[in-house]
Regions:
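Metal-ion/cofactor- or nucleotide/acyl-coenzyme-handling active-site neighborhoods
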Residues: 1-214
């Protein structure tokens, strides 16, 4: 039997779904999703320490060496007794481990035609990093039967909407490798009208003009 994993984000529309799952489902949290989830098996903080340094210093309530979050973020992560995946080990977080970026790139990276000797991963969000690691482990024998998604929406009209195609790309790669994808009820992921069936006209941006098409 393979593992069952649930990726948890902070979107309140579907974050509740994680708590409805049985205890044998691994809970992979990210960033500040500890505000919506009660247990975790792994954690992910992929941002650089000085993430958006200029912006966070302007806000005053954030600090530049805390991954663009409030100072208590590092304090909370420092108390976790589960692996905390990061770009680099943080001495303030005893459970921090380095995300195996090079190994995953070598195994799963795409080959850009302009740089055929440099495999590159398609990753536009922390959730994508999490899915890539799950696929990497699955293909290396630590198999995954089910991948659940909770609190990860990336809805159109939000700053995260540009990250949605990448998450759906990795879900597709997992599905193609035999993993069952289980979505929370009413999620925005993998959901859209059927082209030429559910509507008569293609989606059209009302603000589209020849000038802004470039």
């Amino acid at each position: 039997m393979g593992r069952k994993i649930c990726l948890v984000g902070q979107a309140t529309k579907t974050a509740w779904y994680a708590e409805s799952l049985p205890s044998d489902v691994e809970m992979w949290g990210q960033n500040e999703s500890y505000t919506v989830q009660k247990r975790g098996t792994r954690w992910f903080q992929i941002h650089p320490r000085a993430w958006r340094k200029a912006e966070v210093l302007e806000l005053g309530e954030f600090e530049a060496d805390f991954y663009g979050r409030r100072p208590d973020h590092v304090e909370i992560l420092s108390k976790l007794e589960i692996p905390v995946y990061m770009k680099e080990v943080d001495e303030r977080i005893p459970a921090s481990v380095k995300y195996p970026f090079d190994e995953i790139t070598a195994m799963l990276g795409e080959i850009p035609p302009e740089t055929p000797d440099e495999p590159r991963l398609y990753l536009t969000s922390t959730s994508a990093y999490m899915l890539a690691l799950a696929l990497y482990e699955h293909l290396n024998g630590d198999t995954v039967d089910e991948m659940h998604m909770a609190g990860i929406e990336m809805a159109v009209g939000t700053e995260y909407s540009l990250q949605k195609p990448c998450v759906e790309y990795w879900l597709g790669r997992l599905a193609g490798s035999g993993v069952t994808i289980v979505r929370a009820p009413m999620t925005e992921l993998l959901r859209a009208p059927l082209y030429a069936i559910d509507h008569e006209m293609p989606f059209v941006d009302k603000n589209f003009t020849a000038e802004n098409a470039m």
